[in-house]
Amino acid sequence: MTTALDQLKQYTTVVADTGDFQQLAQYKPQDATTNPSLILKAVQKDAYKPILEKTVRDHRDEPADFIIDRLLIAFGTEILKLIPGRVSTEVDARLSFDTQRSIDKGRELIKLYEDAGIGRERILIKLASTWEGIRAAEVLQKEGIKCNMTLLFSLVQAAASAEAGAQLISPFVGRIYDWYKKQAGADWDEAKNGGANDPGVQSVRRIYTYYKTFGYNTEVMGASFRTTSQITELAGCDLLTISPDLLQKLQDSNDTVERKLSPDALHDKPTERVAIDEASFRFQLNDEAMATEKLSEGIRVFAADAVKLEKLIDSLR
């Protein structure tokens, strides 16, 4: 029997969402994604402490953010030994509202990879999908630095990212689902709001349809999954980045996976493009409570984990 994971790979590029690169080989993903929280989680495992300790030892007198950059590249370099495609490395979330510093950091990370012998075509620089982050991506893309727009929860963020020429976006399925479920409280009906009706799934489907309708080349990579159902409902999406535990569940399953998204079979196609000047972007994002709250929360969480990582580094000096 063909596994659900193998069936999914027929329709979609499968990406592993982890800093725990020792788990990669068994799932044979094309690409991999990391973020500050995943790197923090990984370096607290015995298997990866030597990477952290060596990076600190080699740069003991440098600032913590300097060491974090080298740590990100150390993980990215190891990951790229195990996959044929690209790795996504994230810009510090504390720069999410600073266009120029985000540009500078993106350039620095690419230079570090190139100094390690890795071409920029194998790297995606992750930026938060704020107005400032999207403007940074616009500049970096023109320099041949490919960007992955993360913490994306709304069509307006997706539309602005595509207009800026971003290589890829990462709409967060699970976190959208979490928000609506929390808002509903005891009234949440999983049978009614799951599967194809999952609000996170619907958001990605809407973005995918928008991109394909208007001919954008920006890749859509669904992210932040809670269940295998959310994943299989998006079979056919350009890419899906999936945690190791859900990759394992898909590998253990022989359930049939059918293609749900295709550029040749679009439904509810939009007739107009979204207005994405700065004022319109900010108003539309503000008007969508879920997207506003989850973007803010996501930046806070990633920033807090960066601080925790800095403290961990300082404790090893």
Curated annotation (Swiss-Prot):
It is found in: Cytoplasm. NCBIfam families: talAB. GO terms for biological process: carbohydrate metabolic process; pentose-phosphate shunt. Belongs to the transaldolase family. Type 1 subfamily. It comes from Burkholderia ambifaria (strain MC40-6). It comes from the Bacteria. It is an enzyme of class 2 (transferase). Pathway: Carbohydrate degradation; pentose phosphate pathway; D-glyceraldehyde 3-phosphate and beta-D-fructose 6-phosphate from D-ribose 5-phosphate and D-xylulose 5-phosphate (non-oxidative stage): step 2/3. HAMAP family: Transaldolase_1. This is Transaldolase. Its main location: cytoplasm. One of its GO terms (molecular function) is transaldolase activity. One of its GO terms (cellular component) is cytoplasm. The active site is at residue 126. It catalyses: D-sedoheptulose 7-phosphate + D-glyceraldehyde 3-phosphate = D-erythrose 4-phosphate + beta-D-fructose 6-phosphate. Keywords: Cytoplasm, Pentose shunt, Schiff base, Transferase. PROSITE patterns: TRANSALDOLASE_1, TRANSALDOLASE_2. Its EC number is 2.2.1.2. Homodimer. Transaldolase is important for the balance of metabolites in the pentose-phosphate pathway.
